[in-house]
Amino acid sequence: MKTNVELISTRVYAGRLKDRENLNNSSSGGAFTALSDFFLKNGNAVVAAIYNYENHTTEFQMILDKDQRERAKGSKYMQSKPGCIFREAYRWLMEHSGKKMLFVGMGCQSDGFRKFSEMKGIRDRVYIVDIICHGSPSPKLWREYAESVQKKDGKITFLTFKDKRNGWKSPTAYVKANGEEKSIKDYVKVFYNRCALRPSCYECPYATTERRTDMTIGDFWHIEETIPDFYDSNGNSLFLIHTNRGEELFEKIQSDLDYRLSNTTQCWQANLEAPTKKSEQREEFWNDYKKKGIDFVMKKYGSVPMKTKIKNKLLKIMGGGVHRR
């Protein structure tokens, strides 16, 4: 079905929230907060993933107020369940004539919603944003990990993968169980080791700067090297604008941002060029997981070897770089 959405040559911006409190409470530069604020304050809807503390899954939900939106903020290193959200989104738009919707998800999820919206004739009423993605581990892996943490430490009531207490470039990942912080850096290390991702993630067709969503957002990594005079230690977001609608949307949120025009050379990062490479340990990891369970693989693949710990300590004493993962 014909729409008014037109692809344009991708435009690139670096940006972050002007509001320092909101910036500090965002996992990056506050791109999602700026975008969702614009929709919610005008009585429109947002669709995004929210963590469910009862069953330890991440699920897409319809968001209609800022309190609910707060639960959708932050990085989630697991696959989100779409459930019936496409039908719910369509029904909401049919029941709210003249209203608009923001959909935010990974590349595969957002492109799926784009195709659905075109098929249903609602593409002109939705703005579709995807997030730069490293890949998604199996939901079962995180669920078993969370259940293991709860058995040892008590009920999980809070989760963050990117707390910025040590700055944006050195995020802290932890859960709160019985009110106490519990590090989950072993899970994060497994995530970045590339051995636990879904098979399709290693062949992701969305790992490119040219996409068919309206906008792509993510961390503007290496900005301290490519645009040093714009770098902020509290977070920097990357905006890739792909359509005329994305351009229009970015103009609407500019008043909430400090921003700078950039280019695809300055913003280069691996997952804007190619999918994450499969780890040589992947088959071994899953065999160990099936035979020996979650605690074993987290200890084997999620811990830092003693030799590396000693090296890092020496580097720190000498003022050198620190191996973070």
What residue spans do the PLM features occupy?
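Iron-sulfur-cluster electron-transfer modules
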Residues: 1-105, 252-325
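A short acidic (Asp/Glu
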Residues: 58-60, 112-116, 138-143
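Long, compositionally biased charged/polar accessory segments in the mid-to-C-terminal portions
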Residues: 42-45, 154-325
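Short beta-strand segments
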Residues: 48-50, 104-105, 130-132, 160-162
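Short, surface-exposed basic-aromatic patches at helix termini and helix-loop junctions that form
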Residues: 95, 114-126, 146-151
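Short, flexible loop segments at boundaries between secondary-structure elements
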Residues: 124-148
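Hydrophobic/aromatic beta-strand patches that form the interior of the parallel beta-sheet core
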Residues: 47, 127-129, 215
